[in-house]
Amino acid sequence: MENFTALFGAQTDPPPPPSALGFGPGKPPPPPPPPPGGGPGAAPPSTATSAPAGADKSTAGSGPFYLMRELPGSTELTGSTNLITHYNLEQAYNKFCGKKVKEKLSNFLPDLPGMIDLPGSHDNSSLRSLIEKPPILGGSFNPITGTMLSGFRLHTGPLPEQCRLMHIQPPKKKNKHKHKQSRTQDPVPPETPSDSDHKKKKKKKEEDPERKRKKKEKKKKKNRHSPDHPGMGSSQASSSSSLR
């Protein structure tokens, strides 16, 4: 026995179950694998593929194409159906879209050449007329010669006078912010210097007598309270004698 343990080592103890460590309830050990030759109690291997969790049970045994669904059924609404007639909106369409517009089409598209307001059948400018009656052309196309190409070449030279100032932009005018009162009220005409001087002189003449009277009253009050006034000394002397 000592020789056996020396060759193969001491027998190790099995690890403790997870319930003993506190991680969860203990699970039973897995069953031993079947013998390679198969025994009398061994079951034959299953040939059908097992469906993953969450798949329909009806499609579980249909083979590897269990994710395919049935094709959608035919619907009445397609791209070729008229939705106005399908939803019975003919009256509303005629009510809102059947009115004639007062303004012409050329008012909305002023840059297009030709008579836009008239239909193309009047002047044979419609696409259908070009398809039905194509224009008569020559059988072959001739290349452009060198003399004809000279008309498309650009030659250096001075600009004409009417085109010289086209790239120069005029300076923008600076609009000063005016008061709101000046916008609402009528503009007052400017007074001439003669009128303003005449008004100033009139005001001075009217205010002169009042100013003179006020100035005289102020002077009288100052003289009464000043020590140099003669009446002040006599009044003080009389008051002192009465006290004695």
Curated annotation (Swiss-Prot):
Gene Ontology CC entries for this record: core mediator complex; mediator complex; nucleoplasm; nucleus
Sequence ranges of Low complexity compositional bias: 44-55, 234-244
Key words of the record: Activator, Nucleus, Phosphoprotein, Transcription, Transcription regulation
Gene: Med19
Annotated GO MF terms: transcription coregulator activity
Residue numbers carrying Phosphoserine: S194, S226
Biased composition (Basic residues): 171-182, 212-224
Similarity remark: Belongs to the Mediator complex subunit 19 family.
Region feature (Disordered): 1-67, 171-244
Stated name of the protein: Mediator of RNA polymerase II transcription subunit 19
Alphabetized InterPro entries for the sequence: Mediator_Med19_met
Compartment list: Nucleus
UniProt KW DNA repair keyword: no
Main location: nucleus
Subunit structure: Component of the Mediator complex, which is composed of MED1, MED4, MED6, MED7, MED8, MED9, MED10, MED11, MED12, MED13, MED13L, MED14, MED15, MED16, MED17, MED18, MED19, MED20, MED21, MED22, MED23, MED24, MED25, MED26, MED27, MED29, MED30, MED31, CCNC, CDK8 and CDC2L6/CDK11. The MED12, MED13, CCNC and CDK8 subunits form a distinct module termed the CDK8 module. Mediator containing the CDK8 module is less active than Mediator lacking this module in supporting transcriptional activation.
Source organism of this protein record: Mus musculus
